[in-house]
């Protein structure tokens, strides 16, 4: 049986490519205004989703969820970039209310944090760094790789049955779809 992360990767390959095309920094972050629009869309996606994910007992999977939250980093970027934070629509609940599905959601968010390192390097060419509007893409800083590996170990140790892995893949697909919708809004 393929591992959890092999299944997550193969099961979301199409969605992953679509997201990469949507947020390609070389095409989409050519100006400060384009970057600001992306930061605002990211906040509209992350805050409600993280609020839904916060309801789960992550300790069952050996994960401390609180330090993995990113919406507060985006809020700091919004302030640094002088972007007004408009009201948000009420958070839509996850399609399925189980930790396996939520782990699939986290796979997308943690993978985005890992990929943020590439975007962070590009933002430097616009003069944007963690201190002036690029904190979100800075992720966990020097600990980003370590946090990804810790997440992989925890998720793999928790999602061991075929049903659990299937739920995680469904959660990841759902999250990619939500993210695509928010980037196109």
What are these regions (language model features)?
Residues 1-185:
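Metal- and O2-centered redox machinery and metal/ROS homeostasis
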């Amino acid at each position: 049986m393929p591992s959890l992360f092999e299944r997550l990767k193969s099961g979301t390959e199409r969605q992953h490519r679509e997201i990469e095309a949507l947020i390609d920094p070389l095409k989409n972050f050519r100006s400060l205004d384009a970057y600001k629009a992306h930061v605002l869309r990211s906040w509209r996606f992350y805050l409600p989703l993280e609020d839904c994910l916060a309801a789960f007992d992550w300790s069952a999977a050996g994960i401390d969820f609180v330090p993995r939250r990113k919406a507060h980093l985006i809020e700091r970027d919004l302030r640094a970039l002088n972007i007004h934070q408009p009201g948000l629509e009420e958070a839509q609940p996850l399609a399925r209310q189980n930790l396996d599905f939520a782990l699939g959601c986290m796979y997308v968010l943690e993978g985005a944090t890992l990929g943020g390192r590439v975007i962070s390097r590009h933002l430097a060419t616009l003069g944007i760094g963690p201190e002036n509007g690029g904190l979100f893409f800075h992720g966990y800083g020097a600990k980003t790789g370590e946090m990804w590996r810790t997440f992989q170990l925890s998720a793999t140790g928790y999602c061991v049955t075929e049903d659990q892995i299937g739920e995680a893949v469904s959660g990841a697909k759902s999250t990619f779809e939500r993210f695509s919708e928010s980037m196109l809004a």
